[in-house]
């Protein structure tokens, strides 16, 4: 598989860990380094790319602001430190991106936000709107409310979930090491950097070591887990050193890193999941005009729906049938069954009047629709 280039990608997630962002001695943001990273992000943004940031650092900053001693914190202490640190972290990102004329939007998520369908859809919609407005979403785990039972515990896997949620085509994990090695490079002089990984095998997993610095909760093992999540969803991933200034520029110029490649892309992977992995909860029957529109690559609008069957929630998979009951495709519906039935056959301006809210224009967006999935 040909090794891609950074500028081949249109939507990127950049994960920044605590050990890069925070000076472990002073407990403060590494301002010069962050300014250089922000300049890299601004360059990508000016090129028309969508950029999202998954940023650690709230607990580390909170510890510094509260002058807490070194060592392990109890859960409630970590949560309280995060509450203080998150304010400073959000301000830092807002100011450094704002210096380039870029707005930043803070999103705090928990594991449940990516596991529960409704919350997942709400988070995805918020990210999509921020990107549409050309803002940069800055995402972190909501450490103030996450417990040990319902937390990611590291932002590598969170970043992979965000990349999947946002249909990003590249996830960049900036680390204190420039990629995956055949052995720990600090203790083995014969260790070699692996430039490309086309499949995460048991051998690849065995090369991952334990967690690193005091400030970071992640390590190479969590990065390998992130690679499995990302590549299965059609998102390429790379691990590169963030210790240098302008780390994204270094990647673009061919600097050392490890690519985790996937033959799929986010849209095809998502559509394969919709077509083959989800149990349909209902059926939408559509008119002949809507059938033609769907086959031409359009979204399904409420006006084209003539019948709604089944009990389904927003985001559930449904079968789409033509007026002759032949299956046209499958998709993720934007309304629950009751609301879908109320707005079927109606034009988009009528939807707000009927539902009393400004609803989505599409019953099923084309990115959530697979046409031609009927058996046989």
Curated annotation (Swiss-Prot):
GO molecular function list: ATP binding; glutamate 5-kinase activity; RNA binding
Binding site for ATP: 15, 175-176
Pfam family, any one: AA_kinase
InterPro entries reported for this sequence: AceGlu_kinase-like_sf, Asp/Glu/Uridylate_kinase, G5K_ProB, Glu/AcGlu_kinase, Glu_5kinase, Glu_5kinase/COase_Synthase, Glutamate_5-kinase_CS, PUA
Catalytic activity, EC: 2.7.2.11
TM segment ranges: none
Gene Ontology cellular-component annotations: cytosol
UniProt keyword annotation of tRNA-binding present: no
Recorded metabolic or biological pathway in which this protein acts: Amino-acid biosynthesis; L-proline biosynthesis; L-glutamate 5-semialdehyde from L-glutamate: step 1/2
Family the UniProt entry places it in: Belongs to the glutamate 5-kinase family.
Protein name: Glutamate 5-kinase
Species of the source: Rhodopseudomonas palustris (strain BisB5)
């Amino acid at each position: 598989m040909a090794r891609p280039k950074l500028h081949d990608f249109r939507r990127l997630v950049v994960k920044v860990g605590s050990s890069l962002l925070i000076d472990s001695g002073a407990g403060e943001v590494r301002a010069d380094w962050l300014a250089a990273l922000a300049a890299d992000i601004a360059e990508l943004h000016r090129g028309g790319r969508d950029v999202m940031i998954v940023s650690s650092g709230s607990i580390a900053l909170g510890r510094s602001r509260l002058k807490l001693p070194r060592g392990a914190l109890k859960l409630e202490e970590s949560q309280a430190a995060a509450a203080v640190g998150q304010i400073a972290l959000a301000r830092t990102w807002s100011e450094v991106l704002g210096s380039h004329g870029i707005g930043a939007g803070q999103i705090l998520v928990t594991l449940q936000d990516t596991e529960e369908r409704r919350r997942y859809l709400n988070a995805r919609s918020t990210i999509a709107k921020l990107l549409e407005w050309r803002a940069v979403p800055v995402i972190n785990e909501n450490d103030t409310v996450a417990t040990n039972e319902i937390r990611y515990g590291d932002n590598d896997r969170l970043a992979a979930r965000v990349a999947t949620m946002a249909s990003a085509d590249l996830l960049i994990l900036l680390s204190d090491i420039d990629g995956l090695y055949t052995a720990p490079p600090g203790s083995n002089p014969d260790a070699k950097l692996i430039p490309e990984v086309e499949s995460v095998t048991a051998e690849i997993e065995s090369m991952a070591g334990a967690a690193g610095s005091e400030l970071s909760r992640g390590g190479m093992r969590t990065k390998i887990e992130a690679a499995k999540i990302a590549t299965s969803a059609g998102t390429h991933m790379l691990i590169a050193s963030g210790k240098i200034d302008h780390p994204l520029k270094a990647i673009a110029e061919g600097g050392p890193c490890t690519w985790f490649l996937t033959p799929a892309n986010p849209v095809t992977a998502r559509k394969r999941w919709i077509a083959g992995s989800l149990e349909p909860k209902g059926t939408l029957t559509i008119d002949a005009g809507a059938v033609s529109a769907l086959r031409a690559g359009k979204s399904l609008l409420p006006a084209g729906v003539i019948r709604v069957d089944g009990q389904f929630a927003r985001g559930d998979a449904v079968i789409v049938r033509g007026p002759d009951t032949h299956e046209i495709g499958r998709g993720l519906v934007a309304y629950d069954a009751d609301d879908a039935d109320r707005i079927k056959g109606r034009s988009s301006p009528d939807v707000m009047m009927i539902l009393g809210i400004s609803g989505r224009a599409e019953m099923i967006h084309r990115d959530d629709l697979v046409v031609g999935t009927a058996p046989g």
